[in-house]
Amino acid sequence: MKVWMAILISILCWQSSVWAVCPAWSPARAQEEISRLQQQIKQWDDVYWKEGKSEVEDGVYDQLSARLTQWQRCFGSEPRDVMMPPLNGAVMHPVAHTGVRKMVDKNALSLWMRERSDLWVQPKVDGVAVTLVYRDGKLNKAISRGNGLKGEDWTQKVSLISAVPQTVSGPLANSTLQGEIFLQREGHIQQQMGGINARAKVAGLMMRQDDSDTLNSLGVFVWAWPDGPQLMSDRLKELATAGFTLTQTYTRAVKNADEVARVRNEWWKAELPFVTDGVVVRAAKEPESRHWLPGQAEWLVAWKYQPVAQVAEVKAIQFAVGKSGKISVVASLAPVMLDDKKVQRVNIGSVRRWQEWDIAPGDQILVSLAGQGIPRIDDVVWRGAERTKPTPPENRFNSLTCYFASDVCQEQFISRLVWLGAKQVLGLDGIGEAGWRALHQTHRFEHIFSWLLLTPEQLQNTPGIAKSKSAQLWHQFNLARKQPFTRWVMAMGIPLTRAALNASDERSWSQLLFSTEQFWQQLPGTGSGRARQVIEWKENAQIKKLGSWLAAQQITGFEP
């Protein structure tokens, strides 16, 4: 009873999460958005099944199809059947293809496994499903999955695939098998190589009119033997003897979700002879084949891998001004998971780059992780029907603006605070952008060093700053006073690298102010252009005012 209650709660939570992400559209707009995406997916399907070509990556197709289904459920439409081929000249399957239900996570899989025994895990091979019918020991018919009840006659094509046994004996002599035709790979590592659009490539080869030698690049993985031997071990042995060796090699007994997770992770990183997109867990005990129907298999489930790239909805476009005054564009996203990382924002780059991408709220973009786990945009895979793009701020900022706070300087001013607190500058540990915003909003800083005047009481009474953290911050701010002179000059944004600044041997503000352009130009990595920037910087009125203020605070190197 407890198990069923847990399953019910899990389902309700899943339904709640679906409704929580329903778009806030009017009925008219919902109809338009659903219709447009439905038409696009239908166009992709037509090309896929009629010409054997894929105009879109498998992963993008799957995720946009799921997005369409979600929208249809949100607005009361009938969800479409995904990847349903035309049924001209279709052949009945002796045993229906049931399909496989997907588990959202390990917990859901664990709940499913608790009620079952004699369980086995197999790789979820990424290809196209097929029925193989053997009669009197010979391959009699090969049928594409189709809609699960009917499919296309693929007998001629499959007979040319050398990996498919044309004759069998013993219990298999009069049998029906279900499996996956896949693209044979040598040492395919899913974690590194991804899906390589394998499903579309296999479909393309099977749909071509010419019987080319390329069919020998295909293999078959049998995952079901309806009405076969009762024991899984007997099934695997007979299949291996007949030539279906991969099934025995890649089918393992499992007792719980932890064991499945270990195998799943192993196959994710291992060299395999095929592309996979997860694992399938199945019970050895299956109902008689006459009870098999599409979408009604309770004896097996899939636990798919997380896609290397995820389709994410753009919720908003935001503009940020960096410490140098450059405007960058950030897309705020509906949260997606990438490699156990929750991604809600992705940097687009400059305003020009954003305009080239042509991204607006409501668009669907493909996001992946670049080096060091930084999210990046790979493509814009779908644009909404109604697109309103925000106006970027005026390009009025530069490297010498916003040392002092003002309404128009809000973003660049905060960026300067974040910069000066960094480890390589003043090393103010424990405070980031959110903390600086909280301090500035409460205490209305005059300039980028106003935080030096904050008292322990002021820090303790700052909304958004925990009382336990306020004492630590006050200690950090006091320690900053003892930082070397060069660190403070870096905090002021001098346009030099740390190496060049250290090589200058400048030890005081007065010495720095009297240094000439020729002096700066001689420093390593500093040309005439950079030297002129240093002169402009030190002669700027805001910089001079900050220097005088730091002198009054008796900061090292600034004293008269």
Swiss-Prot record:
The keyword DNA repair applies. InterPro entries: DNA_ligase_AS, DNA_ligase_B, DNA_ligase_CS, DNAligase_adenylation, DNAligase_N, NA-bd_OB-fold, NAD_dep_DNA_ligaseB, NAD_DNA_ligase_OB. Keywords: DNA damage, DNA repair, DNA replication, Ligase, NAD. Its EC number is 6.5.1.2. It is an enzyme of class 6 (ligase). GO terms for molecular function: DNA ligase (NAD+) activity. It holds the Pfam family DNA_ligase_OB. GO terms for biological process: DNA repair; DNA replication. It catalyses: NAD(+) + (deoxyribonucleotide)n-3'-hydroxyl + 5'-phospho-(deoxyribonucleotide)m = (deoxyribonucleotide)n+m + AMP + beta-nicotinamide D-nucleotide. The active site is at residue 124. PANTHER family: DNA LIGASE, DNA LIGASE B. Catalyzes the formation of phosphodiester linkages between 5'-phosphoryl and 3'-hydroxyl groups in double-stranded DNA using NAD as a coenzyme and as the energy source for the reaction. Belongs to the NAD-dependent DNA ligase family. LigB subfamily. This is DNA ligase B. It comes from Escherichia coli O9:H4 (strain HS).
